[in-house]
Amino acid sequence: MHLASLLSSCSLLLLLGALPGWAANNDPIEKVIEGINRGLSSAEREVGKALEGINNGITQAGREVEKVFNGLSSMGNQAGKELEKGVQGLNRGLDKVAHGINNGVGHTGKEAEKLAHGVNHAAGQVGKEADTVIQGVPHGVNQAGSDAGRFGQGAHHATGQAGKEAEKFGQGAHHAAGQFGNEAEKFGQGAHHAAGQFGNEAEKFGQGVHHAAGQFGNEAEKFGQGVHHAAGQAGKEGEKIVQGVQHGVNQAGKEAEKFGQGVHHGAGQFGNEAEKFGQGVHHAAGQAGKEGEKIVQGVQHGVNQAGKEAEKFGQGVHHGAGQFGNEAEKFGQGVHHAAGQAGKEGEKIVQGVQHGVNQAGKEAEKFGKDVHYAAGQAGKEGEKIVQGVQHGVNQAGKEAEKFGQGVHHAAGQFGKEAEKFGQGAHHAAEQAGKQAGKVAQGVHDGVNQAGKEAEKLGHGVNHAAGQAGKEAEKLGQGVHHAAGQAGKQEDRLQQNVHNGVNQAGKEANQLLNDGHPGGSTTQHGGAATTTLTSGASVNKPFMALSVLWKSVTSIIP
């Protein structure tokens, strides 16, 4: 009995001692805590991996962006050098044009002086048998005479008996001035050859006078002044052609009737009122302009259009940074395209940059694709930027003649078929005037701005660095996916990457703004040496592990 009670007591004690351990092993709270600990450890490892992946992705993105800017900087420097060479070539060409124009003007002066002497003699020695011009004309017109025919014949014989048959007044004046041609060329041709024979094919009177006189004066003096200067530069301010013709022929009166009026009365009193110069010369030349345009129109076309085939002068000057011929790329178009389009077959620089940097272009030839490869892939298929700029500036298209040849022809021939670049440059350099943009300004605007309508290069680069085209995924999204969709940190990551890219765009704009005034980006801009502004996010994770752990443990009591 005693033994049984002892055994029962021991069993009870053992049971009581085991109960706490059993209860402890089966405690659900402890299991929950252990599960939470294991979950937090696993979460910590996963978050660490995610943050490390994000950090690596951002670092890699920063390297790629830096490579892009290095490529853009190199491209900009090389392009600047090529553009500088192009500008130097333009300067040399313009110097040659200036020398050619000076020689042409000097020769024109000599010929004009000869013409003035000829006219002087023709006007002063009307004829030994004839009375003075004032008397001769009334007798010639009113007293028909035996040998006196029409006024054309009368003037013809009076000024030197240039022919036996009564040639028209245009021919008479042509021969009277020195028989500048064997066949009665049109008045425009006559004046053209009299001034120096600037062209093999007789250009119209407008062109003839334009080239003959050289457009003396900055603001292109009126036609009256032009003819006045061409005949001898009788005055500094150029008296009106009425006075010029009056004094040149005989000084028939003190006030000098207008040329139209003088010829009008001399030819037979075609009207009581002095007709305009265009009509006067038109009638005086024997109505040489039933087929030809009136002198007024001729002068207008000569200065503005240079004939129906020639572009209007306004367009010519506009295209003087614009378009000078149908076959050759007109100078304006040449310069504009040299910094903008480089011809129909050349890559348009503005579009090229925009497409090349933003959309990588659809065709491998375009300048934009060159920039794209030059900045990112060193141009495996696209031509190098050097070649692109070289072709754009120096050749302006395969069909356009080189600038040197153009200037050479410009100073020497002024083009037999198409108005060669020289003629265009002559118009652009000579008649640009104070109202037209100077050539230097035109080139400067053409190279640096490519027109007010063209987007600035900085704008293009900004889009290139910031958007990389509408079709390309944003850099922030790319890094986001590359890192593995970190989750709630996505917005902050995208924002930081966006800020970094925007800052890079600002640096690119600063680079272009720094390179803009000089016409070439020879100095290294900020984008070349600038690291990613969001470098803090590149070199360290967005949230430290210790901070994350504290935030997790703070929710556990």
Curated annotation (Swiss-Prot):
Region described as Disordered: spans on this chain: 150-175, 422-441, 464-490, 509-533
Record's keyword terms, sorted: Secreted, Signal
Record's subcellular location: Secreted
InterPro entries (UniProt xref): SBSN_GxHH_rpt, Suprabasin
One GO CC annotation: extracellular region
Record's keyword annotation contains Iron-sulfur: no
Protein name: Suprabasin
Phylogenetic classification of the source organism: Eukaryota, Metazoa, Chordata, Craniata, Vertebrata
